[in-house]
Amino acid sequence: MMNKALRSTWQEFQYMISQINNKTNQIIIFKCIQNWYFDKKKLLSLHLIEEFGLEELVNIDIKNYPLEKSECTLEDIKRFLKIQPCSEECMIVWLRDILWELVVLSIDIKCEYCFKLEMSALFDADNEIVFLECNHCGWVKTVDGCSIESIKNIRLATNQDLKLAGLI
């Protein structure tokens, strides 16, 4: 259950998003969410912020990531925000998921395991390669199509990583 201050904070977030023009690009949307987050961060639980990796997404240097290639639209976010989170944890997860959709490049490639379209491009820091992860089942493969057993050190793929991999 969310306390009154958190419910009010979520309502402010919904209102802020509702005031953004539908033709606004993803970079401006990201900056609006980022500014709201920095303003409201003190109201959120640090352990939940850390647990769900919110800081990694909200603190990116936007010029290094493919936000302009994001398929996440303001309309998608507005539809998503019509639902009220039942807890602070849910609110932070939703915020993280919105930022993820804006920051991580989504590729329309069919997963060879579950056969769904849509994989996320991420970076294997140990092997220094971009890999694709299915957004539905989590199956991973290299950009060349080779299956990968496990990846331990994952980070967001930058524009440079994606260019070298031939994805942008």
Where are these regions (language model features)?
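Short terminal alpha-helical segments
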Residues: M1-W36
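Short linker/helix segments within small regulatory modules
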Residues: L122-F131
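Short, charged early-sequence alpha-helical segments and their helix-coil boundaries
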Residues: L43-Q84
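Residues immediately within or flanking Cys/His clusters that coordinate Zn2+
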Residues: S106-D108, F131
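Short cysteine-rich clusters marking metal-coordination/redox-active sites
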Residues: C111-C114, C134
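Cys/His-rich microdomains that often coordinate metals
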Residues: F115-M119, G138-K141
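Short metal-binding segments enriched for Cys and/or His
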Residues: C137-R155, L162
